[in-house]
Amino acid sequence: MAYVITRNAADAEDATQDALVKAWRALGRFRADEPLRPWLLRIVANEARNRRRSAGRRERLVLRAAEGSGEAAPSPETTALAHERRAELLRALDELPDAAREVLACRYLLELSEEETAAALDVPLGTVKSRTSRALERLQEAYEPGT
């Protein structure tokens, strides 16, 4: 989560460590009837946003896309196409607004439910649904592999 927001491995590590310290200190305020994961992810996301804002970094987002089709030794053409498609997808993702990229990261990289995503990003459930829908539409328009 932190890496998706900061787009820098070192900043993401620092943000995660600081967030865990803050979570530890705030553990007494955690409501036991709420799920822990979204609460913790919200703290991490807030710390990462603070770090990114203060640093003013605008590095490119690097996502690990699943590559390969399970073949033992893909052909050079298959490998080249996979790298090209991944580069196209990364360019399309980088064109998305931060809020859209964050919601896609929660939903599809972290595999959070809509409710968990809303809690982690501290936004209403309807906002998660609309951001997800709009972000996927924008990706589909921008990323058309093979064209």
Language-model regions, residue ranges each:
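Amphipathic alpha-helical recognition patches that constitute DNA-binding helices
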Residues: 1, 11, 35-40, 60, ...
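Short, Lys/Arg-enriched C-terminal cap helix and immediately downstream tail that follows
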Residues: 53-56, 96, 101, 136-147
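Acidic, proline/glycine-rich intrinsically disordered inter-domain spacer in sigma factors
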Residues: 66-94
